[in-house]
């Protein structure tokens, strides 16, 4: 996102730490009803020009109309075969009633799923999930942020991605980055990509 400023994606793609390389990246595309991340186009082109599998995410504002937020994402992001599914990032209520927040999320999810013909991934923290989303949107893949846990995030639902660290360092990016892992093998990873 704009927080990482200039990223050298070719260097990132060749980075290896303890025999672990960067296989995928989620890039912030949009926020709310009208904001596009100022570095999205540059990052999207840069990352897609490497062997890194790319996904785009929308930072969801719980008090704003879900369809308007979906339109913002759709007009900004062109997904192609081999990309990760679109992501809705929900982290705060911003004073919204949880029921209204879930209705707005549902609007975004349905509109984006209809447009891209793939189920979006829901990104949230373990605490937010347990408090407001547990039992809802069960048919959608979950990407959960729960930092510095030993083996896995502490949630009862199955998860697809786990953001386990928000203070990572990667050559090619001057600012701290979030580290994520995929729950599955290479075949399972390939199966979730846009076809």
Where are these regions (language model features)?
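Short secondary-structure transition/capping segments
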Residues: 69-79, 99-111, 130-138, 162-178
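Catalytic domains of cell-wall/extracellular-matrix polysaccharide-remodeling enzymes
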Residues: 84-158
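Flexible, glycine-rich phosphate/dinucleotide-binding loops
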Residues: 34, 63, 129, 151, ...
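Generic hydrophobic segment detector
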Residues: 15, 40-47, 114-122, 171-195
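Low-complexity, flexible helical/coil segments
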Residues: 35, 59-65, 89-96, 122-127, ...
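Substrate-binding cleft of extracellular glycoside hydrolase catalytic domains
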Residues: 1-118
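Functionally critical loop-and-helix segments that line ligand-binding/catalytic clefts
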Residues: 1-5, 9-10, 137-195
């Amino acid at each position: 996102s704009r927080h990482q400023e200039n990223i050298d994606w070719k260097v990132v793609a060749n980075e290896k730490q303890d025999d672990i390389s960067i296989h995928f990246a989620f890039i912030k595309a949009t926020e709310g009803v009208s904001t596009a991340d100022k570095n999205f186009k540059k990052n999207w082109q840069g990352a897609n020009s490497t062997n890194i599998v790319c996904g785009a995410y929308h930072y969801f504002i719980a008090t704003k109309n879900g369809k308007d937020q979906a339109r913002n994402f759709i007009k900004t992001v062109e997904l192609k075969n081999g990309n990760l599914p679109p992501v809705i990032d929900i982290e705060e209520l911003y004073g919204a009633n949880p029921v209204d927040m879930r209705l707005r999320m549902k609007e975004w999810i349905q509109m984006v799923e209809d447009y891209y013909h793939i189920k979006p991934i829901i990104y949230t923290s373990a605490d937010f999930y347990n408090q407001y989303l547990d039992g809802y949107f069960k048919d959608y893949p979950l990407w959960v942020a729960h930092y510095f846990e030993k083996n896995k995030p502490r949630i009862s639902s199955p998860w697809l991605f786990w953001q386990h660290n928000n203070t990572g360092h990667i050559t090619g990016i001057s600012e701290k980055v979030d580290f994520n892992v995929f729950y599955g093998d290479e075949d399972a990873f390939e199966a979730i990509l846009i076809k």
